[in-house]
C-alpha cells in the first residue's frame, strides 16, 4: 500500500485543511446550522439500552466527513474488516489471525482458521468457565480446610491484568454474590506483599494468567503466592484447590502444581490486549457471575455486528477513527483524552492506553518502510469531575489542541439524595463540552466583569485571562446505564476504532515488538546486580546507575 501521504483522497483532505482548516469555528458552525446535532450524531439502539455518539462538537463539515470516509474506503478499511472477521492472518509479523471477535460470537456462525472452525473450542472453554464459576460462587468448591472461596487473586500483567481489572471495577454493582477480586501485576514486591497481607489462604483462589507460563513478572509473583500459601497449607497437594491457570503450556502448569483440569486455555489468535473476552476474563466471571459475563460478550457482539454491517458513514467505530485521523494527521494533535463521567469507569482510560498505544504506537508500515506521518496518539484521562480540578485548565486555555471523548450514563447505579449527585455530574459533563466548544469571547468576559462590579483597573488586568478561545473538539458518548451489555459494546467500539486507524496508517495493530528490547536487556542486567564489583559493560549512564545502586545497597547492608 502506498504511503498515506501519497493517497489521492488523503491529499485532497490535506489540501482542504490547508485552505480552510483555520476558518473552522464551532460556535459559528452551530449558529449557522440549527440541525447540526441531528446531522452529526448517531443513536445506537442496542435493545439493551441506547448509546448516543454525538460528534457535532468537532471541527468538521459534511464535506470534511465525506472526504474522511473516502480516505477510509481508499485505504481498504472495508476489505480489511472482512479479512479480520473471516480469520485471515492479518497479524502477519506473527503469522496469526486476529479473532477476539470469535470469543464473543454469540451467533455461533463458523469462523475458520486454517480451514478449522474455532467456535467449538471457544464454546468448550466458555462451558468450562461457566461450570467452574458456578462451583466457586455456590460454595461447592472448597479450599484445603473445607472453607468456601471468598477472595480471588488474579496474577498477570498487561492484557492479563488491565482488562479484567477495568471490567471488574466497572461492574462492581453486579458483584454482590461473588467473591472479592484482587489484581497483582507489578514485579515490585510491594504489590503482592500488600495484597497477601489482607488475605486468608484457606479461602483464597489464585488465578495465574500467562499464555506461556514463563512471563517473568507473573511467574515470580505466582511462586511468591505459592510460598505464602504453603506456609499455612503445608501440603503441596493443596495447591490444586487454590491455584488455577489461564495458559496453553500444560507441562509448565503441571510442574507448578496446578491440576491440568484447572487450566483454562486460549489461543494464539487472541492478542493480550484483546483477551478479556477469553479465559483471561475468568476473574470477571467469578466476580459478577457467568450470566453477566455472557452479557458483556453479547454487548461486544452487538457492536461487532454494527461495525461489520453498517455503512462507513453511519458506523460509530469508523467515525471515531476518522475524527482521530483528522486531528492527528491534519491538525497535528498528539494526544487524546478519555474522560468518563462515571467513577466505576476509573480504569477505562488506562485500559485503552494499552489498547491504543500498544496497537498503534508503530513507525514501520506493513511493507517495512518508515512512515512519514504521525500514527497512534498518546491516550490518557481520568474520571470526571476529578479531572476538572486537575488538568482541564490546559484543555481549555493551554497551547495544545486535545480532542476529548466524554462518556456518561443517563442512569446512575447510585441515585442517592433523590438523584442529586448524578444531576450535578450530568450538568458538569454537559457544561464542559459546551464550554470547550463555545469558549468565552472578550465581550462576554467584559460583561461578566462589569456585572461583578470590578474596577476599570481590574478590567485591564483580568480581561485577557477571562477569555476562552473555545473551538476545542469533543465527542459526547451518552448511554442509558453502565450494564455488562453496554460496557461490552463500548469496549468493542473502541477496539474497532483502533483497528480502523491502523488500517489507514498501514501498520500492524496486533503485534508489540516494542516491548521486547527492554525485556531482553533486563535479563542481561539482572545478574550484573549481584555482588559488589563495578559494572563497565554498558554506556556510562547505565554503568553509573548500576554502580550507584550497588554502592548504596552495600552501604546500607
Curated annotation (Swiss-Prot):
The modification Phosphoserine is found at residues 107, 185, 455. One of its GO terms (biological process) is glucose 6-phosphate metabolic process. It is found in: Cytoplasm; Secreted. Pfam families: PGI. GO terms for cellular component: cytosol; extracellular space. The modification N6-acetyllysine is found at residues 12, 142. It catalyses: alpha-D-glucose 6-phosphate = beta-D-fructose 6-phosphate. Phosphorylation at Ser-185 by CK2 has been shown to decrease enzymatic activity and may contribute to secretion by a non-classical secretory pathway. ISGylated. D-glucose 6-phosphate binds at residues 159-160, 210-215, 354, 358, 389, 519. The modification N-acetylalanine is found at residue 2. Its EC number is 5.3.1.9. Keywords: Acetylation, Cytokine, Cytoplasm, Gluconeogenesis, Glycolysis, Isomerase, Phosphoprotein, Secreted, Ubl conjugation. The active site is at 358 (proton donor), 389, 519. The modification Phosphothreonine is found at residue 250. One of its GO terms (molecular function) is monosaccharide binding. It comes from the Eukaryota. Belongs to the GPI family. HAMAP family: G6P_isomerase. In the cytoplasm, catalyzes the conversion of glucose-6-phosphate to fructose-6-phosphate, the second step in glycolysis, and the reverse reaction during gluconeogenesis. Besides it's role as a glycolytic enzyme, also acts as a secreted cytokine: acts as an angiogenic factor (AMF) that stimulates endothelial cell motility. Acts as a neurotrophic factor, neuroleukin, for spinal and sensory neurons. It is secreted by lectin-stimulated T-cells and induces immunoglobulin secretion. This is Glucose-6-phosphate isomerase. The lineage of its organism: Eukaryota, Metazoa, Chordata, Craniata, Vertebrata. The gene is GPI.
